[in-house]
Amino acid sequence: MKKEYRGKFGNFVHEERKKEEETLEICEDILKNSRNEMAVAMRFLQSAFGALRPTVSGETDVMGTDGKLLFASPTWLLNTFIQNKVWINRMYLHELLHCLFCHLWNRKVKEESDQRLWNLAADIAVENVMDDLYEKAVYIRPNSFRREKYRQWKEKKNVLTADAMFYLLMECEENEIIRLEQEFRRDDHHFWYTPQNRSGMASHQKEWEEMRRKMQTEIELFSKEAAGDSPGLVGHLQAENR
């Protein structure tokens, strides 16, 4: 390669690396600001936010978690931030709630069909909590389809936990499952099923269960006013901690 071409190629590589570093820095700031905004608005979740470390990653097209890290796609982050940053907050909280309710380590998942239903059940459970969470940082008014489905399900189950939803979904026809997936499936669950995550199942689950119990105690003793606008979260914590 001639010297002049080597120089041009070197400049090109340098500029690309600089762009990547700038993009990474912007994405890290977006995640940091999202976490801080929600931690201030929902102080009872501060310890949980501290337990899940955000990282910008090319391993996902959206967002996902393995219970230790929160993986976020840089492309998705930038595009979503431009459209509506509340969606980033919701997805961040979506991942946190999966961890608190230990959806990642459920032992019901033995076959691929179970995995599909469990993924959907877990997403419905956390979306329902967020739709009942009247916090400006994460609130987007649920559409009529969601409201009607919640009404129907709550006629059968008092609290829409993932366990409860799993059994309700087993009664659904395929076309209804597809429609529900279009409405409620949001994040990337493939991190749940990696050999590394399954091997550390017991210890990770125990850590989040302990955090969940402490959170319920804190809300009941100190933060009733702070959690007053989130009956769905309180009900979920009580149901999961029984």
Which residues make up each language-model segment?
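Short, functionally important secondary-structure microenvironments
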Residues: 1-89, 96-242
